[in-house]
Amino acid sequence: MFEPVPDLNLEASVELGEVNIDQTTPMIKENSGFISRSRRLFAHRSKDDERKLALRFFLQRLYFLDHREIHYLFRCVDAVKDVTITKKNNIIVAPYIALLTIASKGCKLTETMIEAFFPELYNEHSKKFKFNSQVSIIQEKLGYQFGNYHVYDFEPYYSTVALAIRDEHSSGIFNIRQESYLVSSLSEITYRFYLINLKSDLVQWSASTGAVINQMVNTVLITVYEKLQLVIENDSQFTCSLAVESKLPIKLLKDRNELFTKFINELKKTSSFKISKRDKDTLLKYFT
């Protein structure tokens, strides 16, 4: 009754590679829970549980924190488990508490660092959930000292760099004593470089404080990093005339070059890591 259609009478040969299921292993912390692609969704019994799960999700990116520091941040989140901070988006509270706690220990993140390690916070475009708005809300709810996160104080940003290149044998949480000279030197260079830009009227006043700080810190970091790679390659030295009171610890930078490179590479992956050629050329004049 029915005649076969020649064009649809096709044959296909599909070859599958050999797969031995017995040899496959699950990923660490892998579970069968459902994670929505449109929003972060955690199975939880309470808001406290949800915050802790969220904190674990975010802190794994801060690879340079040791177990004591991570435990300390969890205890800080646990201390406010009965506080209702936001009616919605409770998950996002945990990383903000972590950032404010780390800031209280003298370490802050520039906009590029925030994008590298907390892209969800950086890419939030809602006015209600923008970074500065959330910082203000959490400071008010938890009784933290009120103030802007980004201020013209460069030491805290370089303290985060110091955390990332710490020696494995450092003692105490957020301890950067061995790297303190590097923090002082980079900060002095940035302060003097910032004043040079002010005198030359090169600072973009329409930009936010965070954007200006981000540009200054990124320029200094990439310039020092590239000079360091040259001296390692040529087995030479370099100095910066802007570092008057605290000379750059070249030996320390050479010893920690692998860690420094890893940190810089994380920053380079971000969209906000943009260096002005004019600023970089101006800064290079002070390096010999």
Swiss-Prot record:
Pfam families (alphabetical): Pox_A8
Keyword line: Activator, Early protein, Transcription, Transcription regulation
Ranges that cross the membrane: none
Induction statement: Expressed in the early phase of the viral replicative cycle.
One GO process term, biological-process aspect: DNA-templated viral transcription
Family the entry assigns: Belongs to the orthopoxvirus OPG134 family.
Functional note: Acts with RNA polymerase to initiate transcription from intermediate gene promoters.
Quaternary structure annotation from Swiss-Prot or TrEMBL: Heterodimer of a 45 kDa (A23R) and a 32 kDa (A8R) subunit to form the virus intermediate transcription factor (VITF)-3.
Name of this chain's protein: Intermediate transcription factor 3 small subunit
UniProt source species: Vaccinia virus (strain Western Reserve) (VACV)
Source species taxonomy: Viruses, Varidnaviria, Bamfordvirae, Nucleocytoviricota, Pokkesviricetes
Name of the coding gene: OPG134
